[in-house]
Structures are given as C-alpha cells and as structure tokens.
Amino acid sequence: MGRGRVQLKRIENKISRQVTFSKRRSGLLKKAHEISVLCDAEVALIVFSTKGKLFEYSSDSSMERILERYERYSLSERQLLSTDPDPQGNWSMDYPKLTARIEVLQRNLRHFVGEDLDPLSLRELQNLEQQLDTALKRIRTRKNQLMHESISELQKKEKSLVEQNNALAKKVKEKEKVEQNNRAQWEQQNNIGQNSSAYVVPPPPLQLPSLTIGGSFVGRAVEEDGAEARPSPNTLMPPWMLRHVNE
C-alpha cells in the first residue's frame, strides 16, 4: 500500500515538534543547497524557530547581496504596481523588511566576531569562513598598499633632506674658501708693510760737546768730507806753565 497523505497541522507534542523541526530544517537546507549547485542559482533561506533562533542558508554570494538584490527588485515592482498616492502606506510596508534586515545584519555582525555560532551548520560555517578569508585578504592588501605609500613618502622626504644637506654643505665650503682667500690677502699685505718699514735709514747720532782738561767745552765739528775732528787751538794753559814761558 502507498503511503497515506500526512495531515498538515501543528504538532502538539513539544518534543515531537522540535524533532520534526530539526529534521525538516536540515532537509530544507539540503534542498536549498542542491538547487543552488545544480541550477547555479542564488538562494537565500531564512528560518526562525519557535524560540526565535535564526537559521539561514545562502549560496556562494553573501546573504546581504541577495537581500539587497531582492529589495531592489521588490521596490521596482512596487513602484510599477502601486497606485496609492499616500507615501505613508509604503513606509508601513517597508518597516517589517527593514526590521528583518537589521536583525540579519546584527546577527551577521555577531558571527563575524565569533559569537552565536552554535546554530550554524557546517555549510554556513564554511561560508562564514570564506567571507572572513576574503575580508582578511582585502585588509592585508589595503594595509600593504598603505605601508608602501608610507615608505615611498619617507624615501622622498629622505631624498629631499639629503639634497638640502648637500646644498648647505656646498655653501659652507664656499664661505670657508672666501674667508681663507681674504685671510691670505690680509697676511700678504701685512708682510709687505713690515718689510718696507725695515729699510728706513736711521737718523745720525747726536754730537755732544766734550770736556777738556782746563774745564772749557770744545765742540766737535764734523767735516763734510768725513775727516776726523781736530782739537781746538784755543786751549788754555795753566798759570805755572805761563810763568816758565815768560822767563
């Protein structure tokens, strides 16, 4: 006999309901994965348990990308079909979707920091790992780019400082060379002045009068031809010699 049709109604037994939810959830996630792989389709599956626990599945692309695509599509469809001139009606329709999106973003944020990972299946953990790996690669690429830019900027500053240092050193050398030339010229002029003053003819010595035996002063005349001075004929004789002469 064939299998009878199962009547769809709420399972009253709590334990049976939890077991059925776990089995059907696993089968639903499996079917979503199969259709994603076999048909190359973007699939997003969101399931909330009776306790409010979230279970989800997304294909290789992230859940946020699929939801954004769905929102754009649904928004364009509503704009084409909506005839309500009151925008508040649209706001009331968008509020539940925005609330659901906020919850998804908050949950993904917790997953990215390593929290609330128990409800995730192996496939979901693999998707999360791939997303984190991709994010880390982008972060490392950006970090390396910034480091290379910083190193290049420092090299440019170093080159500029070296050029400035060389220019200052050149100016200092030129200034020292000018000072050396000025000092050499000054010393040369000083030596020339000292040598010229060494050849000046000294003045003749002053001739002083000489004292004779008789007590009279007789000056010495210097003749123009360079002859020696002669004694003066007006030399006085003592009285005792005069007496003998008169005799």
Swiss-Prot record:
Q: Which superkingdom?
A: Eukaryota
The cross-references to SMART domains, in alphabetical order and at most eight, read: MADS
Where is the protein found, in the record's own terms? Nucleus
The tissues where this chain's protein is expressed are given as: Expressed in tendrils and flowers.
Query: Residue limits of the K-box domain?
Result: 88-178
Any Pfam family the entry gives: K-box
Q: Where is this region: Disordered?
A: 224-247
The MADS-box domain covers: 1-61
Q: Which InterPro entries match?
A: MADS-box/MEF2_TF, MEF2-like_N, TF_Kbox, TF_MADSbox, TF_MADSbox_sf
Q: Tell me which UniProt keywords the record has, alphabetically.
A: DNA-binding, Flowering, Nucleus, Transcription, Transcription regulation
| GO CC list | nucleus
Give this protein's Gene Ontology molecular function annotations: DNA-binding transcription factor activity, RNA polymerase II-specific; protein dimerization activity; RNA polymerase II cis-regulatory region sequence-specific DNA binding
Q: Has the keyword Nucleotide-binding been applied to this entry?
A: no
Task: Provide the primary localization.
Answer: nucleus
List the GO biological process terms: flower development; positive regulation of transcription by RNA polymerase II; regulation of transcription by RNA polymerase II
| PANTHER family for this protein | SERUM RESPONSE FACTOR HOMOLOG (PTHR48019)
State the function annotated in the UniProt record: Probable transcription factor involved in flower development.
Instruction: State the protein's name.
Output: Agamous-like MADS-box protein FUL-L
Q: Which organism is it from?
A: Vitis vinifera (Grape)
Gene that produces this protein:
FULL
